[in-house]
Every structure is written in C-alpha cells, then in structure tokens.
Amino acid sequence: MCQGSICPWRGPLPLLHVRTWIEPVVASTQVATSLYDAGLLLVVKASFGVGPSSNHSSSPSPRGALEDEQQRAISNFYIVYHLVMGLTPLLSAYGLGWLSDRYHRKVSICVPLLGFLLSRLVLLLKVLLDWPVEMLYAGAALTGLCGGFSAFWSGVMALGSLSSSEGRRSLRLIVIDLILGLAGFCGSMVSGHLFKQMVGHSKQGLVLTACSVSCATCALLYSLFVLKVPESKAKPRKAVDIVPGTVGRYDTLDPDQTDKQSVVRPPPPPAMAKSKQIIIGLLFVGAIIYDLAVVGTVDVIPLFVLREPLSWNQVQVGYGMASGYTIFITSFLGVLVFSRYFQDTTMIMIGMVSFASGALLLAFVKETYMFYIARAIMLFALIPITTIRSAMSKLIKGSSYGKVFVTLQLSLTLTGVVTSTLYNKIYQLTMEKFIGTCFALSSFLSFLAILPIGIVAYKQASWLQPGDITEK
C-alpha cells in the first residue's frame, strides 16, 4: 500500500510530507548548474577566441595553431578554476557537515546554495561588465568557501537517507540522482540556444547567465522557506540487522520488507565490527579510483568536442552536455531492475564496466555519431558512486550521515582536483598525437576500481550462512 510520503495526493497530512522532498531544490540547482557550466565554457572560449568556427572546418595550419593555443588557454583556465573550486571547500565543508548533524540538516544545503548563487552572479557580471576572465576565479572561491558541491550533496544525501527505509535506500538515492539528471538534461538542451540569443552582441550569453541566476535564486529561497527536514524512517526492531556489516541485497522494492525480517543470531563479534570498518575503507578506495576515471573524462570532454575532429558549435556543445545527463535516467532504470536481483557490489561492478567500455570507445571517436554511441555505452556509469553511498549508509549510524557523506565527498573532491590538473596536462601534451589518451587512461582506472569492490563482495559472501535470515 502507498504511504503518505509516497502518495502525496491522499490528504492534508501527505501535503506536509511534500515539503520534506529535496527534489525541487535538486532540480532548480541543477538547471542553474547546467546553464552555468555551458555558459562558463562558452564565455571562456569567447574570451580566448580565434574567430568564429564552423563544424568540421578544414582550415589552414596557421588557424590550426591558433586553435591549439586556444585549447591550451582554456585548459589552463580550467586547471586553476578546478583547483580553486576543489580546495576552498576544505575550509568549510566538514564544518558545515558537523553543524548539520548537530544543529540543523538544512545548514549544509542552504549555505552552499548561497555560494552557488554568488558564483552565477559573478558570471553574469562578467558578461554585463566585460570583466577579465580571471574574475571567474573569485566566483569559484565564493562557491568553495560556502561549502561547494561537497557540502551541498552530502546534505542532500543525508536528507534522502533519513527519509527512506534501509530496504529502499539505493532506490531513493538514485531517484534523487534521476531528478538531477533530468534537470541537467533540460538545462543543457536549451543552453546553446539561450547563449545564441544575443549572438553578435557584446553581451552574448546574457540571457543564459540570467536564467542561471534566476534558477539558483529559486533553489535558495525554496530551501530557506519551504523545505522541511524529514523525520528518520528508522524503526525500532526486535532483532539486529539482517546480516551485520553486509551491503544489503534487495529482493524487493517494498520499503517495509526489511522490517519483516528477523535474525536468530547473537550480536556481531569484534572481528565482525573490524570487518565492517575494512569494508567501509574498501568502498572508499573503490569510489576514489572510479571517481578519478569519471572526473578526468568529464573534464576533458568539453575541450575534446571543441577541437577537431568534432569542432562543435554552441548548440552542439549543449546537446553533448545533455547526452551526459541521460546517464542519470538509464542508471535509475538500472538500479530499479538490478536491485531486485543483485547485491550492491554486483551493481557497482556493472556500472564500472559500463563506464570503462564507453571511455575506451571514446578514445577512438572520429565522428559525432561515434561520440553518442560511446556515451550510450556508459548508460550505467552513475550506479557505482550512488550505490557506494547507499552501502556506506547501512554501515553507519544515522547521526553520522552528514560527517561520513561529507568526508566521502571531500575525498572525491580532493582526488578530483588532482585528476583535473593531471588530465588537463596530459591532454595538452597528447592532443596533437593521440587525442584519446585521457579516455584510455580513464578506462584502465575504471577497470582497476573493480578490484576493491570485488574484495568487498568476497567478504560478504564469506559472512552469508544458511539460516541466518528467517521470515516472521
């Protein structure tokens, strides 16, 4: 049967539950972010411009040299930008997570949203006042000092975990990712068209950046005045968890199913508790290695599509970014199906293989249609990180969600900073010889990330014993 929080049309009480949904904040924020990301790339490209470009241009070598110089300038800009964006949250993100756990869950959501709004305003002012491109670093710093994406997403994951039962948590968190993906898809699809609204005008990009600021403002106001913190879904049980320390297996998507299960075994011994810590560590390692591959690929793709052999224009750039967000939809469908039959570790490995295969094909892309085929192969690429978060949430106390999630997110952010710098330098060194080098490296790292997850799966299998779980 549908419950109030699932069926909001069933009366005034469910209407209160609607205010606990984090999805409107995620959607507004992601539309603003997708518009901002496209606008940032196109504004920076225009700032280092070499004149108008056409798709698949066959220009003489002097123009090719200018385009290479433009690529290096854009790449160097993003190296500094990602360094600022990645390092400044270290000053505030964990503190916001601690305040969120101790005082109010909305702290780690509202403060980062303020930073997002300020950075969007900086881009808008750059377009309006023709500021130097270096002023965009200030916008990145403001975002980071307010916690950045690390604090924001950890807050979103904490609220999502609190509002879901353990048996439904992977699905709940992937639904949030689905909303993020749909919003990003919509924003990216229109970004190129919005950027061209004032083509040839000195304020090109004004409409795009203004829309980004508007969406960021809506997200902040909603989180301040409408959003309510949900009550924890945790219920007292007559028995301990299904199998202490394991990463759950979903035989059903019924959120109450886990409450119907009982265990006829004593509390876990100290060795089991230590194994739980080892599993958390292995999940961290797997997440970090996989994130290295993903971040490196995501950072290089915008540069890759602007250069030959693709040489995309503004609208094509928007469509290409939108194709990346379709992964959120396919990953959601993947979790919806796989969670009925597979353990979390199996789903994680499926996602890693999916991304690794797509990245390998991306290394050899020569035409636009090949790019979209490679992106289609990555259809389950989002499953690993989201499922790892869900798996970790089952091994920690609810009161520690904020700190653990922000620690994971900060770890991913730090590795992302290193990866961004490394990949951009590798791209600059190899773009004239083999432009797909970075993608081949990402494929290797993604396959490598399967190893720690496989160890987790092996440890789980050694714990499972016949008769451990009995139905009431």
What are these regions (language model features)?
Residues 85-105, 195-196, 330-344, 427-428:
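Helix-to-loop junctions at the C-terminal end of transmembrane segments
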